[in-house]
């Protein structure tokens, strides 16, 4: 897939090539775990971010960093140039899954729930609208309707995979298996 290019309008602001599927809480003191929700079209962070960052820069100003969970996306570069600026992409295994944090250069930040790209449109819309309600304080798992049992199973599987990889095993991740060798 070829990345979509952002463009500048006459006022020198960045205009997304494709409008991101995004809902944000109104700008106010933080309430709840997330500041809104984003439903990307793919699991390729470097393809999805330019349009999202163009929209979020209206609220955050110049974007400095994006933090994400390593296992949630195909391998991403450490830096991404978008709109003529370089943004650091920092992947962590401890970053809460199904979230990204977008940090502005001035220290402002937004934590977004990431609705998996394969989610049914009706369910994704409902989840995004709920996450963007001003006083919604639901957890990420609550918003995505992930039970504690399911989360425990996913955590156990992820821990086992990380242990296997740290001992020299190759990853079983289907996203990593798709990358050219």
Please give the residue ranges for each predicted region.
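A compositional/structural signature for long, glycine/proline-rich flexible linkers
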Residues: 12-13, 24, 45, 52-58, ...
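Intrinsically disordered, low-complexity boundary segments flanking structured domains
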Residues: 8-11, 25, 52-55, 88-89, ...
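Short linear motifs embedded in intrinsically disordered, proline/glycine-rich low-complexity segments
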Residues: 1-4, 9-14, 59, 174-181
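N-terminal, Lys/Arg- and Ser/Thr-rich interaction peptides
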Residues: 7-33
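Short hinge/gating elements
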Residues: 34-38
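Helix-rich interaction surfaces within compact, conserved domain-sized segments
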Residues: 3, 74-181
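Short, well-structured hydrophobic secondary-structure segments
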Residues: 39-76, 80
């Amino acid at each position: 897939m070829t990345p979509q290019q952002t463009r500048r309008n006459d006022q020198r602001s960045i205009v997304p090539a494709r409008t991101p599927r995004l809902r944000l809480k109104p700008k106010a003191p933080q309430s709840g775990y997330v500041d809104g929700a984003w439903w990307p079209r793919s699991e390729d962070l470097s393809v999805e971010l330019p349009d999202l960052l163009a929209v979020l820069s209206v609220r955050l100003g110049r974007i400095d960093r994006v933090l994400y969970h390593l296992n949630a996306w195909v391998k991403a570069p450490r830096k991404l140039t978008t709109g003529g600026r370089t943004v650091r992409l920092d992947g962590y295994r401890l970053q809460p899954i199904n979230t990204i944090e977008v940090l502005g250069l001035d220290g402002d930040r937004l934590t977004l729930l990431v609705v998996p790209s394969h989610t049914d449109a009706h369910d994704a819309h409902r989840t995004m609208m709920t996450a963007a309600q001003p006083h919604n304080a639901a957890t990420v798992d609550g918003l995505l309707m992930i039970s504690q049992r399911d989360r425990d199973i996913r955590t156990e599987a992820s821990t086992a995979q990380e242990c296997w990889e740290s001992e020299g095993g190759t990853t079983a991740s289907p996203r990593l298996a798709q990358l050219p060798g």
